[in-house]
């Protein structure tokens, strides 16, 4: 899955 926990990925923020 596409996880992203840093502010640059706010549009698809997923932790």
UniProtKB/Swiss-Prot annotation:
It is found in: Secreted. One of its GO terms (cellular component) is extracellular region. The cysteine framework is I (CC-C-C). Alpha3/5 pattern. This is Alpha-conotoxin-like MIA. Disulfide bonds join 4-9, 5-15. Alpha-conotoxins act on postsynaptic membranes, they bind to the nicotinic acetylcholine receptors (nAChR) and thus inhibit them. The modification Cysteine amide is found at residue 15. Belongs to the conotoxin A superfamily.
């Amino acid at each position: 899955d596409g996880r992203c926990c840093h502010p640059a990925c706010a549009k698809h923020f997923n932790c």
